């Protein structure tokens, strides 16, 4: 099964080698037929502490690093390639 890749915005980089990424999704409400936005925060591993608050980043599903951290930051050119592949 392929690993999921999500795009989101960094909302916190306070942790050591950890970032918090807000991922927003849109869907049509089944009854109201209106587009609804929902967001969720994911803790992701940032090995080099390179991501800063406000940046748009890609995160990839991976093995658990801790109780809440099961995503890792996709670095540089790999992120652009993944974005083109997902689109």
Swiss-Prot record:
Pfam family, one: Ribosomal_S17
Record key words, sorted: Ribonucleoprotein, Ribosomal protein, RNA-binding, rRNA-binding
GO cellular component labels: cytosolic small ribosomal subunit
Domain of life assignment: Bacteria
A GO biological-process term: translation
Single annotated GO MF: rRNA binding
The keyword Repeat is assigned to this record: no
Record bears the keyword Ribonucleoprotein: yes
Family, per entry: Belongs to the universal ribosomal protein uS17 family.
Function: One of the primary rRNA binding proteins, it binds specifically to the 5'-end of 16S ribosomal RNA.
PANTHER family to which the protein is assigned, alphabetical: 40S RIBOSOMAL PROTEIN S11 FAMILY MEMBER (PTHR10744), SMALL RIBOSOMAL SUBUNIT PROTEIN US17M (PTHR10744:SF1)
Subunit structure: Part of the 30S ribosomal subunit.
Name of the protein this chain belongs to: Small ribosomal subunit protein uS17
